[in-house]
Design a protein with these regions (language model features):
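N-terminal binding-site loop/beta-alpha segment at the start of enzyme catalytic domains
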Residues: 2-136, 194, 199, 205
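Acidic (Asp/Glu)-rich catalytic clusters
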Residues: 61-63, 125-133, 163-167, 227-233, ...
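Short, acidic/polar
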Residues: 87-101, 151-165, 220-227, 306-309
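Twin-arginine (Tat) signal peptide motif
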Residues: 6-15, 374, 432-438
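Beta/alpha (TIM)-barrel catalytic core signal, keyed to glycine-rich beta->alpha loops juxtaposed to Asp/Glu
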Residues: 12, 46, 179-388, 392-415, ...
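Conserved, mostly hydrophobic/aromatic
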Residues: 59, 71, 109, 124, ...
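Active-site groove signature of glycoside hydrolases
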Residues: 166-186
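Short Fe-S-cluster ligation motifs
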Residues: 398-432, 464-467
Length: 467
């Protein structure tokens, strides 16, 4: 197996590279096209996938060698239930994906009680139970977002349920989930005032938690506060959102976010390993427009567009693992090629990706990452599908500003036909009542009812031809 891939670029050189001056400015370009479901890969490259070339990073606290590609268990494949009443996880497909991943060197699996509408931990546990415990590292979270789960009793119940669903007697990596959502008030309610942080620290001492950390979204005050207590709490790792757009343009994507450049640097100062989420910015970095895609393809014609984003995230030397929610075998295979072994980005490639980020930001997409925390909607809306269709049409140039646009007829037809194909009519934006149940669950802080009502008004204007 390939040794840790840090020797090609040291930390000092890397920061010199990543922090070098103002990069090339960019002009506005249009479009990018959608892909299969979550867009985790543009296409699978040709050729055999090696089983012994995975790049590993060493956890400095434990000496464990962790695969640089980590499996995010947020997007397991689903199928219709036999009784027709909703969806269920396709366990056979999950088993196949996990078997293939382990056979090709992946050993880090990240789940949560909140994933796949509460079904992920159980499905992940069933699949991993078929493998020797020493073959994998399991990460899960205390996902007590809802005020009804903030009490010590409910939080403890969630924690112990994770052990049962995952069928393990210890957790390798346990995270305080989504700190920053709700600010300091939520942190105090979820983890401090109820004694849960103290409890988790004792669980780490007892060995039932091997590594304790947190994942961060939102309020930077909370991130800074928890890091300020590192000498006392000794965080073993921290999970952050990092990709070539969020590196320096996080606030341009979402005003409540903080640049990954800052987050990563703060972790490096304290020698805290970084686990990376959203390396594809919710799939958007695998759905570039034709022009941007062609620029990347010209450099590496045999590699997918998604591979550039994964290489960017994996190049940082203090990254322990890069998570990818791989729903389909083709996504898994493409990512395995990228990390077996990882080829770090060059200075020229960093410049190209910064330019790509600037060009992408010309288009006002909704910062939805398809996490599905907003689901299920009590009124049956498919919220992520609505927002993703809207984003896709923006990137493809199919959101006309008025009926005088040159391509108005084609864009109108593409938007409306695509809308009905992507979202069943009974689950479209016009069904939104504005109840707001979804809003507190969104880690990106989107005002979901307001955005759905905006999209519905746009759809009606297209139908009535009143733009």
């Amino acid at each position: 197996m390939k040794e840790d891939n840090k020797n090609k670029i040291n930390r000092r050189d890397f920061f010199k590279l990543a922090g070098a001056g103002t990069l090339a400015s960019a002009a506005a370009l249009y479009g990018c096209s959608g892909n299969k479901n979550n867009g985790e890969s543009e296409s699978a490259a040709l050729g055999e996938i090696p089983t012994d070339k995975m790049t590993y990073r060493t956890n400095p606290n434990t000496g464990e060698r962790v695969s640089l590609l980590g499996y995010g268990c947020m997007r397991w494949p689903t199928r219709k239930r036999a009784d027709g009443n909703g969806d269920e996880i396709d366990q056979e497909a999950v088993n196949d994906l996990i078997d293939y991943a382990i056979a090709h060197g992946v050993n880090y699996f990240d789940t949560s009680p909140a994933y796949v509408q509460g079904l992920s931990e159980r499905a992940t546990g069933i699949a991993l139970k078929r493998h020797p415990r020493e073959k994998f590292f399991l990460a899960t979270k205390l996902s007590n977002f809802s005020p009804s789960t903030h009490s010590r009793e409910e939080s403890l119940a969630m924690y112990h349920r994770s052990f049962r669903d995952l069928q393990v007697d210890y957790i390798d990596y346990l995270l305080l989930h989504g700190i920053g959502m709700g600010g300091m008030e939520a942190l105090r309610s979820r983890y401090l005032d109820n004694g849960m942080l103290d409890f988790l620290l004792k669980e780490r001492e007892a060995g039932r938690i091997r590594n304790l950390g947190f994942s961060y979204h939102g309020d930077i005050e909370v991130f800074d506060y928890l890091l300020s207590r590192h000498d006392e709490l000794k965080w073993d790792f921290v999970q952050i959102q990092l990709n070539y757009v969020d590196w320096r343009h996080a606030k341009e994507v979402n005003t409540r976010n903080t640049d990954a450049e800052y987050l990563y640097a703060e972790l490096v100062k304290r020698n805290i390993p970084a686990v990376i989420m959203e390396p594809l910015l919710g799939g958007r970095l695998s759905r570039l427009n034709d022009h941007l895609m062609a620029r990347l393809k010209q450099r590496r014609p045999q590699e997918s567009v998604a591979s550039w984003a994964f290489r960017f995230a994996g190049t940082f030397p203090d990254v322990l693992t890069v998570l990818s929610g791989m729903t389909y075998m083709e996504h898994l295979q493409d990512n395995l090629r990228t990390f077996s072994p990882l080829v770090p980005c060059t200075e020229e490639e960093f410049t190209l990706l910064e330019d790509t980020a600037q060009r992408m930001l010309q288009y006002p997409t909704v910062p939805c990452n398809d996490c599905k925390y907003c689901m299920p909607c009590p009124y049956g809306l498919d919220i992520p599908a609505i927002l993703l269709h809207y984003n896709r049409c923006i990137n493809e140039g199919n959101v006309p500003q008025n009926s005088q646009d040159e391509n108005y007829r084609e864009a109108r037809r593409a938007f409306l036909i695509g809308y009905d194909r992507s979202v069943p009519r009974l689950r479209q934006a016009n069904r939104c009542t504005g109840c707001g149940q979804c809003n507190p669950h969104c880690p990106q802080g989107i005002d979901i009812p307001a955005k759905l009502q905006e999209i519905d008004r746009f759809v009606e204007a297209l139908k009535q031809e009143t733009l």
